[in-house]
Amino acid sequence: MEKQELVKRYIETLISSPINLVGYDNFEEAYHFLYIDSTLPMKAEDLGQKFIDVGTGGGVPGVFLAIEFGASGFLIDSVCKKIEYVKNKCEELKIENLEFLCIRAEELKDKGPYREYFDSAVSRAVSKIATVLELTAPYVKVGGKILLYKGPGYTEELGQSVNAMKELGVKLSEVRKYTIKGKDRFLIVFEKFDKTPEKYPRKVGIPEKRPIR
Ligand SMILES: C[S@@+](CC[C@H](N)C(=O)[O-])C[C@H]1O[C@@H](n2cnc3c(N)ncnc32)[C@H](O)[C@@H]1O
């Protein structure tokens, strides 16, 4: 199926879902605030070949990135019914470059070969920057990127993440500003320059409750 047709079908799937996946029931809004938001600030080279989407919910941004750029996505979320729904719909649409796992990001380190495994990590609307860095950095290769979708509040969160960045082996490389229907949005791009200590991510809930300071 052609890319734009796949995007259209996937959005229709999201807005008609019986479980509340994305908070939009209008096609045009969902098209802009989900698909355009996911793809506009991204470049194919950011993702590399394999990326992880932590807290993908309804497959955002992971499904749209896989369709748009052809990279292989590994999409995780702690809510199994969301992952099941998204997985089934992607299978129906024959989107083949995606894998899914229902798991907390904190627990992925004990499952499979995923430590320092991905070329990049993406995450949108999951938690504050310091928390999300702890949930993503351990799974990205040295030299890879972490790309976080944020609103205008990102500056304060970034200021509170200086120690987390140092501790996790990541540094800020770029902030890409873009606008969706008059709303300012930012893609915060980090580079992983060093290995992340084995103790990260800490136990379930700790990255959220006690972000690295
Ligand atoms: C507000 S939703 C955002 C979903 C999607 N990324 C989007 O932009 O529409 C946050 C999602 O993150 C998931 N989540 C939160 N903490 C998580 C964790 N530690 N590990 C895996 N998933 C997590 C939640 O289950 C939820 O589906």
PLM-predicted stretches and their roles:
Residues 109-120:
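A short acidic, Gly/Pro-enriched loop at the edge of an enzyme's catalytic core
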Residues 119-131, 138, 152:
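A short SAM/SAH-binding and catalytic strip from SAM-dependent methyltransferases
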Residues 1-48, 52, 81, 87-98:
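Class I SAM-dependent transferase core
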Residues 140-142:
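Helix-to-beta-strand junctions that scaffold the AdoMet/dcAdoMet cofactor pocket
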Residues 72-77:
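Conserved SAM-binding motif I beta-strand of class I
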Residues 160-213:
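SAM/dcSAM-binding transferase cores
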